[in-house]
A protein has these predicted regions:
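Active-site helix-to-loop segments that bind/position phosphate- or nucleotide-bearing substrates
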Residues: 1-125
Protein backbone atom coordinates (compact mmCIF):
# COMPACT_ATOMS: atom_id res chain seq x y z
CA UNK A 1 0.00 0.00 0.00
CA UNK A 2 2.92 2.38 0.56
CA UNK A 3 3.55 2.59 -3.20
CA UNK A 4 -0.02 3.84 -3.70
CA UNK A 5 0.29 6.69 -1.17
CA UNK A 6 1.06 10.28 -2.13
CA UNK A 7 3.26 10.56 0.96
CA UNK A 8 4.53 7.91 3.40
CA UNK A 9 2.84 7.93 6.82
CA UNK A 10 4.30 10.52 9.18
CA UNK A 11 3.13 8.92 12.42
CA UNK A 12 4.39 5.45 13.17
CA UNK A 13 3.59 4.40 16.73
CA UNK A 14 1.66 5.16 19.87
CA UNK A 15 1.70 3.90 23.42
CA UNK A 16 -0.73 4.07 26.29
CA UNK A 17 -0.09 4.53 29.98
CA UNK A 18 -2.55 3.94 32.84
CA UNK A 19 -2.22 5.57 36.27
CA UNK A 20 -4.84 6.35 38.91
CA UNK A 21 -7.74 5.36 36.67
CA UNK A 22 -6.59 7.59 33.80
CA UNK A 23 -5.43 6.53 30.35
CA UNK A 24 -2.79 8.69 28.67
CA UNK A 25 -1.66 8.32 25.07
CA UNK A 26 1.60 9.36 23.38
CA UNK A 27 2.22 9.10 19.66
CA UNK A 28 5.38 9.50 17.57
CA UNK A 29 5.83 11.09 14.15
CA UNK A 30 8.90 11.11 11.93
CA UNK A 31 7.68 14.30 10.25
CA UNK A 32 5.15 16.98 11.23
CA UNK A 33 3.53 19.43 8.79
CA UNK A 34 2.45 22.08 11.29
CA UNK A 35 -0.32 23.63 9.21
CA UNK A 36 -2.07 20.72 7.47
CA UNK A 37 -0.98 17.56 9.28
CA UNK A 38 -0.49 18.21 12.99
CA UNK A 39 -4.00 19.61 13.70
CA UNK A 40 -5.51 16.50 12.08
CA UNK A 41 -3.10 14.23 14.01
CA UNK A 42 -4.00 15.89 17.32
CA UNK A 43 -7.73 15.48 16.74
CA UNK A 44 -7.33 11.90 15.46
CA UNK A 45 -5.25 10.73 18.41
CA UNK A 46 -7.52 12.65 20.77
CA UNK A 47 -10.45 10.70 19.35
CA UNK A 48 -8.51 7.43 19.68
CA UNK A 49 -7.83 8.26 23.34
CA UNK A 50 -11.54 8.91 23.95
CA UNK A 51 -12.52 5.67 22.17
CA UNK A 52 -10.04 3.66 24.24
CA UNK A 53 -11.37 5.28 27.42
CA UNK A 54 -14.96 4.54 26.42
CA UNK A 55 -13.99 0.91 25.81
CA UNK A 56 -11.96 0.44 29.00
CA UNK A 57 -13.96 2.60 31.42
CA UNK A 58 -10.88 4.70 32.22
CA UNK A 59 -10.86 8.51 32.29
CA UNK A 60 -8.89 10.45 29.66
CA UNK A 61 -5.47 11.54 30.91
CA UNK A 62 -2.79 13.33 28.92
CA UNK A 63 -2.38 13.39 25.13
CA UNK A 64 1.25 13.80 24.05
CA UNK A 65 2.70 14.12 20.54
CA UNK A 66 6.40 13.65 19.78
CA UNK A 67 7.50 15.15 16.45
CA UNK A 68 10.70 14.65 14.47
CA UNK A 69 11.11 16.86 11.39
CA UNK A 70 8.69 19.64 12.41
CA UNK A 71 8.12 22.21 9.68
CA UNK A 72 5.91 24.93 8.22
CA UNK A 73 6.10 24.87 4.43
CA UNK A 74 6.87 28.15 2.67
CA UNK A 75 3.60 27.97 0.71
CA UNK A 76 1.65 27.67 4.01
CA UNK A 77 3.02 30.80 5.72
CA UNK A 78 0.21 33.13 4.57
CA UNK A 79 -2.43 30.58 5.61
CA UNK A 80 -0.74 30.09 9.00
CA UNK A 81 -0.64 33.86 9.58
CA UNK A 82 -4.36 33.99 8.79
CA UNK A 83 -4.99 31.17 11.28
CA UNK A 84 -3.16 33.11 14.00
CA UNK A 85 -5.59 36.04 13.59
CA UNK A 86 -8.66 33.86 14.08
CA UNK A 87 -10.89 33.95 17.14
CA UNK A 88 -10.44 30.97 19.45
CA UNK A 89 -13.60 29.12 20.44
CA UNK A 90 -14.29 26.88 23.41
CA UNK A 91 -13.70 23.22 22.69
CA UNK A 92 -16.82 21.22 21.85
CA UNK A 93 -18.12 18.35 23.92
CA UNK A 94 -17.48 14.97 22.28
CA UNK A 95 -20.31 12.47 22.63
CA UNK A 96 -19.56 8.86 21.67
CA UNK A 97 -22.14 6.14 21.13
CA UNK A 98 -22.30 2.61 19.74
CA UNK A 99 -18.56 2.15 20.30
CA UNK A 100 -17.19 -1.16 19.03
CA UNK A 101 -13.51 -0.32 18.74
CA UNK A 102 -12.52 -3.88 17.79
CA UNK A 103 -14.62 -3.61 14.63
CA UNK A 104 -13.87 0.08 14.04
CA UNK A 105 -17.49 1.09 14.54
CA UNK A 106 -18.60 4.12 16.53
CA UNK A 107 -20.66 7.29 16.31
CA UNK A 108 -19.23 10.70 17.21
CA UNK A 109 -21.26 13.83 17.91
CA UNK A 110 -19.63 17.21 18.49
CA UNK A 111 -21.81 19.37 20.72
CA UNK A 112 -21.43 23.17 20.60
CA UNK A 113 -18.76 23.01 17.89
CA UNK A 114 -17.95 26.50 16.63
CA UNK A 115 -15.40 27.23 13.91
CA UNK A 116 -14.11 29.89 11.59
CA UNK A 117 -14.24 29.53 7.77
CA UNK A 118 -11.88 26.99 6.22
CA UNK A 119 -8.40 28.08 5.16
CA UNK A 120 -7.18 26.29 2.05
CA UNK A 121 -3.52 25.37 1.60
CA UNK A 122 -1.87 23.14 -1.02
CA UNK A 123 -0.43 19.75 -0.13
CA UNK A 124 3.36 19.91 -0.09
CA UNK A 125 5.85 17.08 -0.32
Amino acid sequence: ELDQMTLPPCHYSFQCYVADGELSLMWNQRSADLFLGVPFNISSYGLLLLLLCETTGLKPGTLIGSFGDTHLYQNHITAAKTQLTREQHALPTVKLSNVDILNGEFNVELIDYKHEPAIKAPLSN
